[in-house]
Amino acid sequence: MAQRRDHITAAAQALRGRRWPVKEAPDHIPRTAGLYAIYSDHDAWGDLGYDCRADTPLYIGKSEDDLVERDLATHFAVDTSKPARTGSSTVRRSFAALLRDRLNLRAVARNPAKPGHFAHYALTPEGDDRLTAWMHAHLSIAVWPAPMDLDITLKKLETAMLIAFDPLLNLTKAPHPSPRLRAARKVMAAEARESAQAAGE
């Protein structure tokens, strides 16, 4: 039990600690399981429509196998040789919903050939590029690589961090998820549905 508390304390300290801008993060983040926290600069809070909560992460998540693949590749599209995949990233969908008007983003079906599950909306390629550029300009990352002797599941540890930090963009398990984010994501899902219906006419 004492070791478990130590892991919880260590994770919280790491997620409050050193952060790397998205573009620099690949040189510092290990390819291992662990937790990550996404932070923003002061201007980004205003872009997203929230009052600034300095030193509070916007989002906390986990990777069961590879922080680089889950965090940097999927959410932040740091590998420019691969297209961004908002349809596969709840983090990108949340940022897209809140930045829809500012970045002129349009939601589309994740799989245009077989549209459905519109809550998992994607963006047009041009919109994905604008979202990625904004994320690279404003966001930074802190990580906690999981140790080999971890005696608590990452899922439980993630839950403990969500309760401790209460990040705005986590819609489950955080004590106070943002109603405005939920509403904004519903707008995007409806737009993706309408886009698919128009394409099928």
Give the location of each predicted region.
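PLD/PLD-like phosphodiesterase catalytic module centered on the HKD motif
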Residues: 135
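GIY-YIG nuclease catalytic motif and its immediate N-terminal context
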Residues: 1-130, 139-201
